[in-house]
Each structure stands twice: as structure tokens, then as C-alpha cells.
Amino acid sequence: MTNISQTFMSHLLEFLKHRSVGTVVPSSAFLGKKMYGNIDFSKAEVVVEFGPGCGAFTKDILAKINPNCTLILFETNTVFYNKLTTSIKDKRVIILNKNAEQIGDLLAVKNMGKVDYIFSSIPLALIPKGVKRSILQNAVSNLKPNGKYIQFQYSLADYKLLKKHFSRVRLKFTMLNFPPAFVYSCSV
């Protein structure tokens, strides 16, 4: 079985087993381009990825960030976490088997300050309201003043919630993903 087939099957099995996995297949490169294609990472010091899954975006982000930037991955699914720890061996990366709500605690322990960008693949539609709010509040309070929170979803169900937490929310859409996806680019 090829790596692509293994990744697809692993993702499908995790989707069937765990409600917290939001899609049957990994996200497409087209969706990644909508999320981070226009971002200048040259001055970024800390970038965070919530719910990287099997790392569909992670390697592209790593290729774009500068040599002194830290990329922090928050992945609660143990199978995906283990795959990330075995496939990513970059000294700029911190991989955590923790909930995104713990971002502030980690930044404090590591004495890292605020974050430039947060990319989120967390399926907000599947998360209880209180947890959703907590994740977004923690994202807002840990972003730099010019930082961005970029979230993709398969519906507009949480658009109002994002507008409550962020002063500016821009919306993009791509059909070139399965399923097609909305990308929210949010500023504090």
C-alpha cells in the first residue's frame, strides 16, 4: 500500500472511530493554499496549528516559516499525534497531545510570548459550545495585535461565533477540497 493510501485509510478509520475527526479524508493542497498561501511568514516567531491531523498542512507551513520560527502543533487524537511525532523531525516543531484550550499555558511555560498565526482545522461544528468559546477566547488572548487566526470549516454555522470573538472576519471558499470548505481569516 502506498503512503497516500495508508494516510487515506488511517484518516478514514479515525473518522469512523472518533467524533472529533471532522472529515473522512485529509485536506487538499488547494485548501492549504486558501489558508496560508498569501501569508508572509518571514517575520513570524511563533506559529500554531490546532488539529493538524496527519499533517496535511504542516509540511507546507514548515517550508514557509523562517529558520528561527517555532511551529506548535496541538493534536488530541492519539493516532494522529503518534504519526506526527514519527514523521516530523524538525527542531522548530513542538508536537503536543493536548487540547487547543491549553495554548496559553504552553506559551507561558515555554516563555514564548504571543503568536503570529494560528491555523485551525478543528471541526468546530462537532465541539460543544463552551469548549468552542474557550478555544476562541484562548486564541484571541494569545495572538499578537497583528496576528491572524485562520480556521476552515465545511459550513457557515460558526460564522457569527467567530465574529463575536474577532474584530474582523474575512471569508473565502474553495470547491477544490472534499468536502468543499470555507476559510475564515480572523483578526483581533
Name each model-derived stretch:
Residues 4-42:
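Class I SAM-dependent methyltransferase Rossmann-like catalytic core
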Residues 43-53:
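Conserved class I S-adenosyl-L-methionine
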Residues 55-59:
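Glycine-rich SAM-binding Motif I of class I
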Residues 70-75:
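Conserved SAM-binding motif I beta-strand of class I
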Residues 80-110:
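S-adenosyl-L-methionine
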Residues 133-145:
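A short glycine-rich, Lys/Arg-flanked "PGG" loop and its adjoining helix->strand segment in the class I
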Residues 143-153:
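Conserved beta-strand signature within the Rossmann-like core of class I S-adenosyl-L-methionine
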Residues 174-188:
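Core SAM-dependent methyltransferase catalytic element
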